[in-house]
Swiss-Prot record:
Stored HAMAP family: SlyX
Organism of origin: Shewanella baltica (strain OS155 / ATCC BAA-1091)
S-S pairs: none
Alphabetical list of InterPro entries matching this protein: SlyX
Transmembrane segments: none
Identification of the protein by name: Protein SlyX homolog
Length: 70
């Protein structure tokens, strides 16, 4: 009977460690989700700033006249 009791105790110990690991991983996922949400907010703000910028007075490469050949 002691063998069965030892196995039960071993399983209970393993379960306790697994529950702790699951909780630690859950906290890490929560932290990463907050970080992703913050980064998404920053990206949306940058997109808005880029869209609000005045177009540049410089010509694009397609509009630029080719350099003279020497």
């Amino acid at each position: 009977m002691q063998g069965v009791q030892a196995q039960i105790e071993d399983l209970e110990t393993k379960l306790a460690f697994q529950e702790l690991t699951v909780e630690e991983l859950n906290q890490e996922v929560i932290k990463l989700n907050r970080l992703v949400a913050h980064q998404q907010h920053q990206i949306h703000m940058l997109i808005g700033k880029l869209q609000d910028m005045e177009p540049s007075n410089m010509a694009t490469q397609a509009e630029e006249t080719p350099p003279p050949h020497y």
